[in-house]
């Protein structure tokens, strides 16, 4: 994901947040804390999606279909949330269904489309890694952890300029995940499969 952040910086989409006043101690502390959070996220999500779900689906479907279904779950669940926060006195038997409906509407909201596609490609990339490389669950956890950590650090150190002429390369989801990430991971996968074909030739 480093090339993505380099492009975002040089296109002035990511602009250094000059209001932050860092000391070496604060920077290291923040880096370590976010690494711990990122590791936990990577461990849980990869164990679930590329571990339990993908392995289970591979028993019933071709590998490509299993990767696609897993990736759709992975991308969709990132948006399965509701903003409404009803008061205790307002909760009724239908409240849960209302919140669930709002959560599912977030998944199909056109505003989130570029981020959903990018996260779908993240899922496909990790699925290919899981199925093509031995002892790959650890690599998936490592990749996922490093990406989450980089995004968290980027959001702390930089501001996203949504007025940039290149703002279409990112989404409002987190200021990073968007078309640029989707294109980068797609190009990486295409390059990998071309390399695999040339090895067989």
Which role fits each region the language model picked out?
Residues 3-11, 76-85, 150-155:
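C-terminal TM-helix exit segments that contain a strictly Trp-centered aromatic cap at the helix terminus
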Residues 68-71, 93-98, 102-169:
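Functionally important transmembrane alpha-helices
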């Amino acid at each position: 994901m480093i090339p993505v952040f380099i492009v975002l910086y040089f296109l002035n989409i990511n602009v250094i947040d000059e209001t932050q006043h860092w000391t070496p101690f604060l920077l290291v502390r923040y880096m370590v804390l976010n690494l711990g959070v990122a590791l936990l996220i990577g461990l849980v999500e990869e164990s679930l999606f590329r571990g339990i779900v993908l392995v289970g689906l591979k028993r019933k479907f071709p590998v490509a279909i299993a990767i696609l279904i897993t990736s759709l779950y992975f991308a969709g669940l990132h948006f399965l949330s509701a903003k409404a926060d009803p008061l205790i006195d307002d909760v009724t038997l239908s409240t849960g269904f209302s919140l669930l409906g709002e959560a599912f509407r977030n998944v199909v909201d056109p505003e989130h489309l570029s981020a959903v596609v990018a996260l779908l490609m993240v899922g496909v990339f990790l699925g290919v890694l899981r199925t093509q490389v031995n002892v790959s669950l650890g690599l998936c956890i490592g990749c996922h952890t490093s990406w989450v950590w980089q995004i968290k650090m980027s959001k702390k150190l930089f501001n996203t300029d949504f007025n940039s002429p290149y703002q279409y390369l990112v989404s409002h989801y987190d200021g990073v995940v968007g078309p640029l990430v989707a294109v980068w991971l797609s190009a990486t996968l295409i390059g990998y499969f071309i390399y695999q074909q040339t090895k067989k030739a």
